[in-house]
From Swiss-Prot:
Protein name listed in UniProt: Large ribosomal subunit protein mL65
Family per similarity comment: Belongs to the mitochondrion-specific ribosomal protein mL65 family.
Locations listed in the record: Mitochondrion
Gene Ontology molecular function, alphabetical: structural constituent of ribosome
UniProt main location, coarse: mitochondrion
Domain of life: Eukaryota
Cited PANTHER family: LARGE RIBOSOMAL SUBUNIT PROTEIN ML65 (PTHR13014:SF3), MITOCHONDRIAL 28S RIBOSOMAL PROTEIN S30/P52 PRO-APOTOTIC PROTEIN (PTHR13014)
Annotated gene: MRPS30
Keyword set, alphabetical order: Mitochondrion, Ribonucleoprotein, Ribosomal protein
Provenance organism: Bos taurus
Disulfide bonds: none
Amino acid sequence: MAATRCWRFVLRSPGLSLHTAAEATVTAPEVTGSDVKAAPVARYPPIVASLTADSKAARQRRVERWQATVHAAKSVDEKLRILTKMQFMKYVVYPQTFALNADRWYQSFTKTVFLSGLPPPQAQPDREPAQVVDLAALRAAVCDCLLQEHFFLRRKKRAPIYQERYAVASPFLDQLVPSLTGLLSAYNPVLAAAALDCNRPVHFYWLRGEEIIPGGHRKGRVDAVRYQINDKPHNQIRISRQLPEFVPLDYSVPVEVPVKNCKPDKLPLFKRQYENAIFIGTKTADPLCYGHTQFHLLPDKLKRERLLKQNCADQIEVIFRANAIASLFAWTGAQAMYQGFWSEADVTRPFVSQGVITDGKYFSFFCYQLNTLALTAQADQNNPRKNICWGTQSMPLYETIEDNDVKGFNDDVLLQLVHFLLNRPEEDKAQLLVN
C-alpha cells in the first residue's frame, strides 16, 4: 500500500510582508547624528588575492608588492638593484643601425616625438656668442685638427677594411672636442669643471608595452616588453648641474608619437637575456651626474657613399635621427633614474641633453628633453607627456682637403658647435647677468 501523505499547515508569524517591508524602508525617516552607532571594526584581515595564484588579481598584487619594495628603497643604488635584478628576455636596441626607417620605431619604443630644427634660443647675455668668441681662433684650431689627421700625420700601416674613414675621424674627434672645450672654457666656466669621457659605456633598461608569451613554461601569460640600450659615445661632457629646459614639462606637442602595431622583431630586433644595466658613464656618487653634450661617430658601414651606392639616399638622415633618439634617450633616462625617478615615480622636472652625430665630415645636431619615464602599460594609460627630440639635417664641415689647405670650411657648423658648448645651467646665467 502506498503511504499516506500528511500535510501540516504552519501559521504565519505576525509581521510585515516583503512588499510592505520594502515600502516601510523607503518611507522610513533617515537617522543621523548621535542616533547612529559606530560600525564595529572588522576583526578579520582583509581578503586579498594569493601571491602564488595564476590569476589577474594575484599578478596585480605581486606587481604592487614589488613596486612598494622599490618605493621603500633607501638609496638610489638599492633602487637600481631592485629594478634591474630580474633577468628576462629583452629586446636589444642598437643606436647605430642599418634597419630601414629605424627612427620611427625608436620613437615608438621611447615615446619620443621628433621636431625638425633646433629649439628656440634661450635668454642670452647682451651680446651674441659669435660676437664674444674669437671665431678665427676656433676656426684655426679646427683646421689644425683636420690637417693633423689628413695631411701632417703619415700613417705607414693601412687601416683595416671598413675602417678607413673611422681610423682618421676618430683621432680627429678626440682632438676636436678637447680643443674647443679648452678654448671656450674662458667664456663658459662650466666647461672648466666638467668631465670629458672618451668611449665610456652608457646603458639603459626600461619597459614599454605588453605581450603574450608565446612559448616556454610561462606560455600564455601577459608580460611587459623589455628593452635594453648599450651605447658607447665617442665623447661626452658631464657637468654638476642640470641644463635649462627647452620647453615646459607639460608642453603640449602637436605631433603624435608613431604607433607600431607589429612586434619589434620586424625591425628587426632580437631578444637576449643578460644582465640589466642602467649607467650614465659614472657611478651614482659622482657629483658630475648631469649630461651636457654627447659626440657620436658613425662607422664606415653606415657612411654616406655606401648608402648612395645601395640606392638608400632616403636613409642617410634616418641613421642620424635614430642614433640621436636612442642615445640621448638612454643618457637622459639614466640621469633621471640616478635622481630617484622611475616609471611609477615620474620625473618632476625635465632632463635635457645635447648630441652631435658625425661621420668625420658631416655633422648633425640634436637636442633631447626627457619629460616622462612612465612608459609601462599601466603608467602610460593617462600620461599626456611626450619626450621631445629636435634635430637638424647633416651639414658638411668642409668640402675637401688639398695639400695643406682646408677648402670650403663651413662656419655654420662651427657656430652651432659653439652654441652647444656655451650652453650652461640657469644659475650660471643668472650670476653672469648680475656681474
